[in-house]
Regions:
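Secretory targeting signals
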Residues: 71-81, 129-194, 198, 206-221
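Juxtamembrane/interface segments at transmembrane-helix termini
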Residues: 44, 101-105, 109, 192, ...
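Aromatic- and glycine-rich beta-strand/loop motifs that create alpha-glucan
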Residues: 1-24
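Helix-loop-helix units of permease transmembrane domains in multi-pass membrane transporters
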Residues: 100-132
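Terminal transmembrane helical anchor/hairpin motif
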Residues: 4-5, 40-78, 203-283
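Hydrophobic cores of alpha-helical transmembrane segments in multi-pass inner/ER membrane proteins
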Residues: 92-94, 172-179, 272-282
């Protein structure tokens, strides 16, 4: 019979306990990027509304101002909050690197591989541990932010369906970039090299496309700049860049006037990234 300490649940529980710093870091990151900006925005909107009432604003003006306040709140609460996306990307890099950095230390490798646990199971435990350390605080802060929004009267800003789409999108992109970070760390024999490889993997498609556009614009006088939709197609290999172009389960509505996908469902894109995440994790 497998002992409790060597069971999958026991190993994950012990891993999370040893990685409390990651839980604290994730909680702090989402408080600063998600909860605080939302509270500050909603509080400012309420103060502005109170000032308009004191000044004797007409009902139509109050309604228009409130509609604008709800739209602004939706940005911070929903899927167009760039601070949350940045936090997700950074935490994916930190978790992916930290959970597998032991492979770069011979003494730690000897210790972990001497445990009565297969290497496949050890990989799965480390991967799940890192995911739990980030996703659990994320979900808690998402729920807390939504509760605060309803308590302050901004429940109409984002529907429940849209909010669930935002949560699923954030988790999907986190798992994809977390898997890419973990794979880079496993393949490299040095943590610094692993971080540089991750930087290249995340940003190389964007950098290459920018250089391509810049050189053509500089040396080809008849060159017509690429459209936003074509640029998006070229950036599909860069999940970090694409992440900022989606709003939950839809493409971002405020990206650009000539972006034909703006506001439309992004189910196919998310399915492609989900398949990519599963493939990388299975490696």
């Amino acid at each position: 019979m497998m002992s409790r300490s060597s069971s999958s649940k026991g190993l994950v529980r012990d891993g999370v306990r040893r990685s409390l710093w990651a839980v604290v870091l994730s909680t702090l990151a989402f408080v600063v990027s998600m909860l605080l900006p939302s509270l500050m925005n909603m509080q400012q909107a309420l103060e502005n509304r109170k000032g308009m009432i004191v000044d004797g604003a007409r009902a139509s003006e109050l309604a228009q101002s409130w509609k604008s306040s709800l739209a602004d709140a939706a940005i911070y609460i929903g899927g167009e909050n760039a601070l949350v996306k940045l936090a997700v990307i950074l935490l994916a890099v930190v978790a992916g690197t930290a959970m597998f950095a032991y492979l770069h230390d011979k003494r730690k490798v000897d210790f972990y591989h001497s445990l009565p646990v297969s290497r496949e199971k050890l990989y799965l435990v480390n991967f799940v541990t890192g995911a739990v350390c980030v996703i659990a605080p994320y979900l808690v802060l998402r729920v807390l932010t939504l509760v605060c929004a309803h308590a302050m009267g901004f429940g109409e800003a984002v529907s429940v369906g849209t909010y669930l789409g935002v949560i699923l999108c954030d988790i999907l992109f986190f798992l994809l970039m977390y898997a890419m970070s973990a794979l880079s760390t496993i393949l490299c024999g040095n943590t610094i090299i692993a971080l540089l490889l991750q930087l290249w993997v995340y940003l190389a498609p964007l950098a290459i496309q920018m250089m391509h556009e810049g050189l053509l614009s500089l040396y080809c006088k008849t060159y017509d700049s690429i459209s936003y939709s074509d640029l998006f197609n070229h950036l599909r290999l860069s999940p970090a860049a694409t992440y900022f172009m989606v709003n939950g389960a839809n493409y971002g509505s405020g990206l650009a006037d000539n972006f034909i996908r703006a506001g439309k469902p992004a189910y196919m894109l998310l399915a492609e990234y989900a398949a990519a995440a599963l493939f990388i994790i299975a490696l």
